[in-house]
Regions:
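Extended beta-strand/beta-hairpin segments
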Residues: 1-45, 55-58
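Alpha-helical metal-binding/catalytic segments enriched in His/Glu/Asp
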Residues: 50-51
């Protein structure tokens, strides 16, 4: 899988892979705009989703 990351305005980031686009931002307290989940929020959510998948399948 190829992932392309684009730097948007302020601290916003965009990752494109397959047919998906994911936008990330930092919270206002970290000088972001709070317009999207932070990269770390996505990391935690993806870990929980992986665990949930394996619980459901096995």
């Amino acid at each position: 899988m190829e992932i392309k990351v684009n730097f948007l305005d302020n601290l916003r980031l965009e990752a494109k892979f397959d047919d998906f686009t994911v936008t990330a931002d930092q919270p206002i307290r970290y000088k972001g705009d709070g317009s999207a989940p932070s990269p770390f929020d996505y990391f935690l959510a993806s870990s929980a989703l992986c665990a949930a998948y394996f619980v459901k399948v096995y």
